[in-house]
Amino acid sequence: LLEWFKRPEEPVSKPLPKSVIVAALVLAPLVLAFIAYSRPWYFNQSYLGGFLVFELMTAAVWMYRRVFFVLVIVAFLFAGIELPVGSVWTAGRWAILGVGALVGSSIMLRDRKYRIGWFHVLALFAVLAALVSAAVSRYSGLSSLKVLSLLTLFIYAGTGARVSAAGRENRFFAGLLTGCEVFVGAVGAAYLAGIEVMGNPNSLGAVMGVVGAPILLWGVLVSEETFPRRRRMALFVLAVYLTFASHARAGMVAAFISCGLLCMVLRKYRMLINGVVVLAILVAGAAVLRPEQFSNTVAALTDTVIFKGKDPSEGLLGSRLSPWQAAVDSIHKHFWFGTGFGTSDNGQDATESLGKFATVVAASSEHGSSYLAILSWVGMVGVLPFVLLMLVLLWKVIETVVWMRRTGNPYHPAVPLAMVILAGILHASLEDWLFAPGYYLCVFYWSVAFIFVDYVPALATAESRSVLFWRSRAIQPRLGEVAPSR
């Protein structure tokens, strides 16, 4: 027995013989071919797409902080654009968001260094208010699913999105800026080729006016080298052009106010004046060289952009009067608890199939404003947490703008996010996407909103103009010094 104990230990895992490896390489294609012949439904688009999503999700979980935020945004974006890949992501996006929320929550519970404040408490109360409205809704099942999607989004935004940015701000914001460049360039190339990838003009105006234009303008301001600055300026001009080409007034207003305010508070008056002068020269040149065509263009733009094809006697917002009136009527009819979060009482039979992974027309309607939509959905009883949530965001934006005006410093993580939040608040007053968790812009907006709330408290210790809190070139650890308060 003693000799047996003295024997050298054998390795726990031995390398596989070469013959086994060769046999596996030979037999694997044959097995796959047999399965494809005997069970061809395993190789249809849905199964293969689901397998691809599973692979991507597994890899993203392995590199959670670096990759998962991008995967979530891409999944919801692909589910909403007019491309063949959209069908695979319609259901897969919810699995990705759920896994992201679960893993993000686990990381936060493990690290125990992330701050929970009033904003996060209000988000929880907003979900509870939505759940109450779903309980009394005509379409209780569908509304409950939408509440679940809102809860999942808020959990991911409050955990996974914050984890993706905290402690690695340089990489996160460099990636955010690069992602905007790629996205705007790709959308511009697609529209040049005649492909309307965003589906409808309002969506194009929304993403360009709320996200593309303010972030790219900020990228121009923080660029330290000539070529990146010129590239971002060209893409910013493209984003502004696409916003105007969409004829979406909400997108134009959001882009104009957010970008104009960014230049004003950072004292970039020369850039603002140069932009106005260039635009005036282009307009004047077109009027002089082709007066008749210019006159026709102005008349067409007045009809399609300002009045949206409605009678001018109805006023500037004539196209919004009908959905606004319908929303007000719905609020009067369901005053206290609303029609149920994410649903409208259109008289559709509640026993019929109303969809599980995407919104259907039978249980929804246009409200013309995100704020009228949420009031119609949850009623007077449930709207207070949502109102307070938006007021907290607006106050954080004001704090950031005051700091920007005092220091003139664009090198802080809160600066671009504040402009996106402000643009979203303005845009949502004319479009009802702000509380639609299946919409890619809603997912992006609330993700960066939770990140933004983390960085505003750090402004109190970031008073010096000479300190650069973010650099567009070398990845530096200095921004970690102004990481969110924990």
PLM segments and residue spans:
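Helix-loop-helix junctions and helix-breaking kinks within/between transmembrane helices
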Residues: 34-47, 84-92, 140-146, 196-206, ...
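Long extracytoplasmic/lumenal interhelical loops at the membrane interface
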Residues: 310-325, 329, 333, 337-378, ...
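Hydrophobic transmembrane alpha-helices and their immediate junctions
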Residues: 378-422
